[in-house]
């Protein structure tokens, strides 16, 4: 797992689905990260609102009791990925940013979100470029 020293602190990076697994957060805690960044891509227009498809063939972590289809993809990203696991890393804050737009013919979905030890906040789902800040 990559950790980069920045002026704001030690930044841990989890790419997309890596953010769904608790062992990655334990590893980042061992590297004493202060911040997390999760670049992500959710395939298909409107996928955020559709039923969650589960862990797509990977072993489901022991702390996940939900089964595929029991919540939306968006709710799953908010509970079982970085926003729901940031406390396991020791980081003060984190951000998940979804690539949006048309990649080949796949379309995309997702709401970027910012999290800290107290909870998380979704970014608006407006179209176009944006800047998302977390004041530390």
What annotation goes with each model-predicted range?
Residues 12-14, 58:
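Hydrophobic, structured segments
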Residues 1, 129-136:
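A short, polar/charged loop-to-alpha-helix boundary motif
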Residues 1, 16, 109:
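Extracellular structured ligand-interaction cores
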Residues 19-132:
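CN hydrolase (nitrilase-like) catalytic-core segments centered on the catalytic cysteine
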Residues 2-12, 35:
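Beta-strand-turn-beta hairpins that frame and shape the catalytic cleft
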């Amino acid at each position: 797992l990559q950790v980069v020293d920045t002026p704001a602190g030690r930044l841990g990076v989890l790419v997309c689905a890596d953010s769904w697994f608790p062992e990655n957060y334990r590893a980042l805690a061992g590297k004493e990260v202060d911040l997390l960044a999760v670049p992500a891509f959710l395939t298909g227009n409107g996928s955020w609102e559709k039923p969650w498809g589960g862990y797509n063939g990977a072993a489901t972590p022991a702390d996940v009791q939900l089964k595929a289809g029991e919540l939306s993809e968006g709710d799953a990203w908010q509970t079982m990925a970085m926003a729901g696991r940031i406390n396991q890393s020791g980081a003060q804050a984190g951000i998940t940013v979804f690539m949006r737009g048309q990649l080949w013919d796949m379309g995309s979905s997702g709401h970027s979100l910012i999290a800290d030890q107290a909870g998380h906040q979704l970014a608006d789902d407006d179209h176009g470029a944006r800047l998302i800040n977390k004041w530390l």
